[in-house]
Amino acid sequence: MMARALVQSTNILPSVAGERAGQFNGSRKDQRTVRMLCNVKCCSSRLNNFAGLRGCNALDTLLVKSGETLHSKVAAATFVRRPRGCRFVPKAMFERFTEKAIKVIMLAQEEARRLGHNFVGTEQILLGLIGEGTGIAAKVLKSMGINLKDARVEVEKIIGRGSGFIAVEIPFTPRAKRVLELSLEEARQLGHNYIGSEHLLLGLLREGEGVAARVLENLGADPTNIRTQVIRMVGESSEAVGASVGGGTSGLKMPTLEEYGTNLTKLAEEGKLDPVVGRQAQIERVTQILGRRTKNNPCLIGEPGVGKTAIAEGLAQRIANGDVPETIEGKKVITLDMGLLVAGTKYRGEFEERLKKLMEEIKQSDEIILFIDEVHTLIGAGAAEGAIDAANILKPALARGELQCIGATTLDEYRKHIEKDPALERRFQPVKVPEPSVDETIQILKGLRERYEIHHKLHYTDEAIEAAAKLSHQYISDRFLPDKAIDLIDEAGSRVRLRHAQLPEEARELEKELRQITKEKNEAVRGQDFEKAGELRDREMDLKAQISALIDKNKEKSKAESEAGDAAGPIVTEADIQHIVSSWTGIPVEKVSTDESDRLLKMEETLHTRVIGQDEAVKAISRAIRRARVGLKNPNRPIASFIFSGPTGVGKSELAKSLATYYFGSEEAMIRLDMSEFMERHTVSKLIGSPPGYVGYTEGGQLTEAVRRRPYTVVLFDEIEKAHPDVFNMMLQILEDGRLTDSKGRTVDFKNTLLIMTSNVGSSVIEKGGRRIGFDLDFDEKDSSYNRIKSLVTEELKQYFRPEFLNRLSEMIVFRQLTKLEVKEIADIMLKEVFVRLKNKEIELQVTERFRDRVVDEGYNPSYGARPLRRAIMRLLEDSMAEKMLAGEIKEGDSVIVDVDSDGNVTVLNGTSGAPSDSAPEPILV
């Protein structure tokens, strides 16, 4: 290898001569031209048994001047072996290429392969510039009407396709190398320390000859016009280029900042940023900190969605308007994309190199204010084993005031990351950003209204704006203003626009028919049935005309409606905002419709179809639901909280289930917690989640997670007296403030839940007092007896539960014992459930009055409520039916009558014989 290098070194003499000629002529050309571009011809001679290098070489005189040796010069170049005419470009030049410029060169090589050429010429570089697609050069060429397809055709016309062997490494032609040299010169003239796709295009235009120039000429592009457009897009005029060539620094560009940052001040000047309403105090404080001599780095700290980024945008808008003190006047706010900065840094040192370049550009400019959103990502960014992360690289500059940086992060992330690094924390001055009030949010929404109206092409009413702020504050508890209110008006606008953009039902049907006919027509053409295809085509044209007419009619109707309403397009009303809140949370906040009003007024009747008796409890629950639905309940407390006390089996849990079924949709809509599972002290943590370090910490609490997912529901704490006393302490804040903090520190909102606690405390008192309540007593005497029992039960509850717990409850309801008549009604409900199960098996069941009385007699027990009734039905009916079905006496499609004979035995009759028709009740269908 060294021998080959020695032989090849003799071929660099033309470059050496050029170097010396440049020195004698007083040229400013860099003495490193040899390093930047060489044309080496591989010598066909071979040296065998080479013993070593001589101490002196023809190049040594030149190389010593630049502090280099032949060894280092040869090592700096990358050689590619070729039979003859081997060309190469040293790596040092490509180090200055941007990623887009490197992509252009790679695409040029791909184009050469595609055309079968064993070289990369100016025409391939031109194709690469067009194909890159995103750079300045590609945009300029596209604006001139030059596309890749036409350019390829022109190239093939001029030079044709090759058919030779294509190697892995394709060399450059001398003219292509000249283009690369000229692109370097163009970059220097523009004051850039990099070579981008725009410089390659300028070099291509400056070369002026070759296939690429002919292609541009054939495509009708004016090279002078292209050059002007490129320089304009780069941000330089002809005069500025001349000034920078003359030694000025005004042409200095900041490629790293442009690549990894966004200029907020420029966006503000162009009016592309949303207006910032309020936040005057925070912007003033940020301005004060930026005016400091050292440690002039404000850090905006606040909850997610309170408007931290908006403060940086507000500062950029003030700078653009000139409404800032002279300390920061004329500066640019540039937001840095940390993800983009880290992306693609595969090798060690790449990230640090990017960051150092960025810092150098900021120091040179002295007019940059860097904004880093999510500033905690600095810590650990780019850090590999043995590497330094971004925070440690930035620390010295942040402390000395060389770098003005605005950070933004949440309270949690600030505590977790920045406070753990005191050296970084002291360099940032914290600026607290509180959540705005509802009134401030309304002002913010009114400021943003115009932008959203333009985007959605509709109009927002003042009522909708106010409803968005108020309803989001009341019902969406896990997010912060103004973010959640802005999301509400945005989604409501999207919903209304989609609703108005929908085609009429008739047009949708015609479109469906049109798709079918088009499909049939294509099949007919494939089957060469052209006569049928012609008929279908005529039908297709008719349908298209009909659909077009319907769409025009719909547009005219919408236009007339908007003109009648004096509004630009559809209108977003308060009802639309309410609908979005309901769809987000599941809480009905829309105005009560007529149907729902009737349902709420008849709620007692509805609940009584499943819960027999217990009028006091049913009325209390119905009142609470009505109060909540019309919006009269206390917004800071749950809908209601009850203790249902009474003997077992009288319908305490059943009432909660029936409420969940009839009003909340299904029994599963209820959150049921069996408090007998929380008898021990350590099990209490299951409600809110295990503490850190314990099993189940990541899963969340049984109560808190369920309520977070379904905030509008019934929460049933069954058998509350079985729970450990610590449970009651935890429930105090739920009952009073409607909130509970889980093990992860998140606040769960209970303001839209109905809390029901069942208890058997006082059942012995009810049993003793209940015996005196007979069937023949007057209503007044019944009520006085019930009131006496209620007072006794309340006293017993006070002995068992702490006063601060009982005092927070909405109501303590004592359930009565069931009478025999009520048990008979319950028997009908339970029998109906059996009928439904058999109906699913296609067996029709009827029971006689005698059998019903037998069930009630066996199942009635005042002390145990309705549960003995279920056992009686299971024993008398279900067991008898199961035996007959297994014996094959009852099959699908049979009609079965269950009766009791004179001896009191249950008889199951298949068919209608053996039982009088008047005694057999009609099957109860559900």
From Swiss-Prot:
Signal peptide stretch: none
Record region (Repeat 1): 97-162
Domain Clp R: 94-236
Region (II): 572-763
Location relative to the cell: Plastid, Chloroplast
Keyword Nucleus found: no
Keyword Transit peptide tagged: yes
Record-linked CDD domains: AAA, RecA-like_ClpB_Hsp104-like
Molecular function, one GO term: ATP hydrolysis activity
Binding annotation for ATP: 302-309, 646-653
Keywords recorded for this protein, A-Z: ATP-binding, Chaperone, Chloroplast, Nucleotide-binding, Plastid, Repeat, Transit peptide
Repeat 2, as annotated region: 172-236
Positions of the UniProt region annotated as I: 257-504
SMART domains reported for this sequence: AAA (SM00382), ClpB_D2-small (SM01086)
Domain UVR: residue ranges: 511-546
SUPFAM superfamilies hit by this protein: Double Clp-N motif, P-loop containing nucleoside triphosphate hydrolases
GO cellular component: chloroplast
PANTHER family tied to this protein: ATP-DEPENDENT CLP PROTEASE, CHAPERONE PROTEIN CLPC1, CHLOROPLASTIC-LIKE
Family: Belongs to the ClpA/ClpB family. ClpC subfamily.
Biological role stated in the UniProt entry: May interact with a ClpP-like protease involved in degradation of denatured proteins in the chloroplast.
The protein, known as: ATP-dependent Clp protease ATP-binding subunit ClpA homolog CD4A, chloroplastic
Species assigned in the record: Solanum lycopersicum
